[in-house]
Regions:
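Charged, alpha-helix-forming regions
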Residues: 16, 21-23, 33-42, 127-134, ...
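Long amphipathic all-alpha helical oligomerization modules
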Residues: 109-174
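Long, charged alpha-helical scaffolding segments
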Residues: 60-110, 115, 129, 160-163, ...
Length: 174
């Protein structure tokens, strides 16, 4: 499931949305199998490896939705726990940074500001979450890390925009 979800995120960055959807569909099928197989084994169902798999699945689904400008799926729709969903939401911020950096390299700034705003919004939502660490599986650390990711991205975007303006002015002079 983690492999499918990770491959889906890579497909999103290659702009292969159909492949990403297929991979996430496969991951979703495995998730339903896991839920069915472990339904009578609560301790295993709530073990860390299931949480990690759900988190990766959430990250893939959220990243695909945000980049493709689709409605954000909720944890109920994905069939995962709230804690896994929030962790996946936090992890998607790093994928949005990658999307922005890839866009800057392609000199396509059309959605960079929008994605930075989305990153800020995710951070704002995660700041309001107050789960015990036992349930949140590192969400507080993820939230703390996100702030730095956003600020580095903001700096990279600002430098790129300023360089673009400088280049345009130099072309006007030349």
């Amino acid at each position: 499931m983690i492999r499918y979800s990770s491959a889906a995120v890579r497909a999103v960055h290659r702009q292969e949305q159909d492949e990403a959807r297929q991979l996430l569909d496969s991951a979703g099928e495995l998730l339903r199998e896991i839920d069915g197989d472990l339904a009578e084994h609560e301790r295993l169902l709530h073990a860390g490896f299931v949480h990690d798999a759900q988190k990766e699945f959430a990250e893939g689904c959220i990243t695909l939705a945000l980049i493709c400008e689709k409605a954000l799926p909720g944890p109920e729709t994905l069939g995962i726990s709230n804690a896994s969903y929030l962790d996946g939401l936090g992890e998607s911020v790093g994928e949005l940074r990658r999307y922005i950096l890839d866009s800057l390299r392609r000199e396509d700034l059309s959605r960079c500001e929008e994605m930075l705003t989305v990153m800020d919004a995710i951070y704002g939502v995660l700041l309001t979450m107050d789960f015990p660490e036992l349930l949140a599986h590192g969400l507080r650390h993820t939230t703390d890390t996100i702030r730095g990711v956003i600020e580095r991205t903001r700096g990279d975007l600002t430098v790129s925009l300023r360089q673009r303006k400088l280049k345009a002015r130099l072309n006007d002079l030349g």
